[in-house]
């Protein structure tokens, strides 16, 4: 099975596909509640708990992580935002590697 992740600090999407490409699960983690998710590590821990559940429930043998947003958008991104996204992508990528023990595949955003 394949686990696909679209990582963001506000909403991170995930999809689990079986070997025929059929969707097993498709959802997102909404982490916009600043009272619940005060720090970036609170968000990472929240995702980690579900990834541990996925590891126990599904025979995931491939992980695909969308490449993080890499360019400035007039009025839509700042250096601080870009750094935060890059840092969170790295944290979640490491958690995936640690839990699943496999190399990750990354791809360019559309």
Q: Where in this protein do the model-derived segments appear?
A:
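Phosphate- and other anionic-substrate recognition elements at nucleic-acid/protein interfaces
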Residues: 1-110
């Amino acid at each position: 099975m394949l686990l696909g992740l679209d990582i963001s600090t506000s909403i991170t999407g995930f999809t689990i596909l079986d070997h025929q490409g059929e969707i097993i699960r498709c959802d997102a983690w909404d982490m916009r509640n600043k009272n619940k998710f005060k720090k970036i590590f609170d968000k990472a821990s929240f995702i980690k708990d579900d990834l541990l559940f996925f590891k126990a429930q599904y025979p995931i043998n491939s992980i695909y992580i969308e490449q993080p947003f890499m360019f400035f958008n007039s009025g839509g991104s700042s250096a601080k935002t870009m750094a935060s996204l890059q840092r969170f992508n790295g944290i979640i990528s490491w958690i995936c590697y640690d839990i699943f023990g496999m190399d990750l595949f990354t791809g360019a955003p559309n």
